[in-house]
Amino acid sequence: MGRILIADDHDALRRGLARGLTEAGHEVDEASNGNAAIERLHEGHFDVVLSDLKMGGSDGLDVLRTARTLHPTTAVILMTAFGTVNTAVEAMKIGAFDYVQKPFEIEEMEVKIEKAIEMRRI
């Protein structure tokens, strides 16, 4: 299992996702906005970061750039309800591991996280 940071300004989604991933055996930390996520990245390493694209303060692309700089092996999965193809392409070019449209099922996210953790080990 892995150490995961969830950054999302929608409390219910963030807490529900954290609960599901904790029950699946992951160690989970939460950030309610992009600035808090960047602060957590400065404090330590995560195997996977799940970040909302649109948040107050720094956005998901800022979180992605910070993760790439501080922890190049950390997989970042961006989540959004309002994304476009151009945004997805930009995120992948910057180094996102994956890009997920909301709403999604927890099982879908668990598979993506496991794949990200496996890829880190190769």
Enumerate the predicted regions with their spans.
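Charged docking surfaces used in two-component/phosphorelay signaling
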Residues: 15-23
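Active-site beta3 strand of CheY-like receiver
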Residues: 45-50
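Active-site residues of response regulator receiver
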Residues: 8, 52, 80
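Short amphipathic alpha-helix used as the core "switch/output" element in two-component signaling
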Residues: 39, 61-72, 90
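The feature encodes the CheY-like receiver
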Residues: 14, 56, 84
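Short hydrophobic/Thr-rich beta-strand motif most characteristic of the beta2 strand and flanking loop
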Residues: 25-32, 40
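Acidic catalytic/metal-coordinating carboxylates
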Residues: 32-36, 59-62
